[in-house]
Amino acid sequence: MAPKISISLNPPYNGEFYSSNDQMSGIVSLQLTKALSIRKISVILKGFSETLTKIDQEYMFQQNGMMMPGQDNKSFHTLMKFEQRVFPPDNVWNALDGSSKPFKVKPGSYNYSFQFDKFPRKPECLKNHTAKTVAFVTRSNARLPPTFNSHWQEFNKIDNLDLYFYSFGKVIYMVQVQIELGKSSSWFKPFHKLIREIETFEFIPEPKDLIIEPDEDDNEELNAFSNNSRGNSMVTNNEFFNSSNLKVPSKDVKVVNGVGYIKSDRNFSQANSILIENGDIRSRPVSSVTSTRQSTRLVNGMKVFPSTYKMGLPDGESNMRIEVRSRDLKQIYRKDYLFRSGSQNFDKVYVVMEGNIASLSKMQITPLKLQLNLLETTTYLSQGIANGNYSSLKLIEIDLNQLKSNKPLLDLNEIRENFDGSMFECELRLKDHPILRKLVFNEEDYRHRGNRLYSFKTCTIKRIFSLQLLIEWGINGIRKQSEVNIDPVQIFCQVREHVEAEALPRYVPPPTYTEMAS
């Protein structure tokens, strides 16, 4: 009967997943029902990333009309690998002086403990990157990525093409026990036999090691997409490549320290499919879709995220748009308040109008419904071919008029001119809504397609998120919808660390003294 091996890992410090400050440790249990010749027992801590990308039919035809054979493009990166021998002990191993003679181990139960150092900060694969390696990160920005799609095998059991293509990228960490048996005396079995047992685990680095560095050319403006242009993004497409109206210029590939990397993440991930040939990027031709490109600006030290399009008003001359103003909407941690006053997320939302003030003040403009979506874009890269996957999570959908409050969410009596007098604005007080002000992000620690909600970027996998705020309006009895996209938003599955001021010591009155009578 074969030996029975079990691996018991010590729990992580936070009780949920292993992080940068943890040391992987545990016990290997070995049960033998009969004597066995064992040369050594090793414990291996390792992690790897793997991607598979495909080329769609339009790329299989060259300019001369010949058909290029299709093939899968695979990429494998070793993120880390550490080995520790637990049997025989060091003093015995050193005394063997290279001898391959095995040990005869009697039947019974044996336990071997192991412990590794803290997880490295950078992946091991960086030393293998060359000038021809095209990656999402530079050497300086590369960090050990979190676990991703560790349950990818379950996706293949589901009749769902979305999950099938989503499983083409994975980051897996494991502890592997390897038992090397003694050499067989038979001439037809001349090699050592290996027995292996594997235990996977979830690893998510500290937030500081998950932060995605901003693109050097995109600090001044963000690309926003209209609801029409991202229609296919709301429900994940079944095709290999989802439709997009962005094309990637060749300037977005840059060589840093001898390694090519994608300089403009946003354009690259939104492109339908990308083929890199001799440093030149060609994007798949897509149908023409109207989109609106909006840029952010600063107002009183706050970033302003405008709606992707303006809505015409009934007088035929005026229009309105929505603006979200925030100082810190680019990063959201789990259990962060989304609409609460002081949250710096959606607590400052304004309706900005252009037109005649007398005409505007007579209109009946009422917010009716609100929907907040979290949009995921996951991109896999392999041998110059990138495939994108889009999906959407509905965070909340609410009827704004279901619960009446003492003060309306939008009071046009408070309309005022903006700082330069060219427009009028009025605050939409979503922070005063009794339900929205209590809403926190990802309170239940939701797993989307088997993965916690976190943004990350590694050599060949990039997972980014954006927020989409949809508001349905009633304007003089006519229903219209506004859309604001915050793209991208850094998402963390950890709870934000709140630095609390140390409480002052309690005041203790000094003792009183009385003179003793002489």
From Swiss-Prot:
Crosslinked residue numbers (Glycyl lysine isopeptide (Lys-Gly) (interchain with G-Cter in ubiquitin)): K118
CDD domains on file: ART10-like (cd22952)
Principal subcellular localisation of the protein: cytoplasm
Presence of the UniProt keyword Cytoplasm in the record: yes
Annotated GO biological process: endocytosis
The record's account of how the chain is modified after translation: Ubiquitinated by RSP5.
Keyword NADP: no
Protein purpose: May regulate endocytosis by recruiting RSP5 ubiquitin ligase activity to specific plasma membrane proteins in response to extracellular stimuli.
Protein name: Arrestin-related trafficking adapter 10
Provenance organism: Saccharomyces cerevisiae (strain YJM789) (Baker's yeast)
Organism classification: Eukaryota, Fungi, Dikarya, Ascomycota, Saccharomycotina
Gene (UniProt): ART10
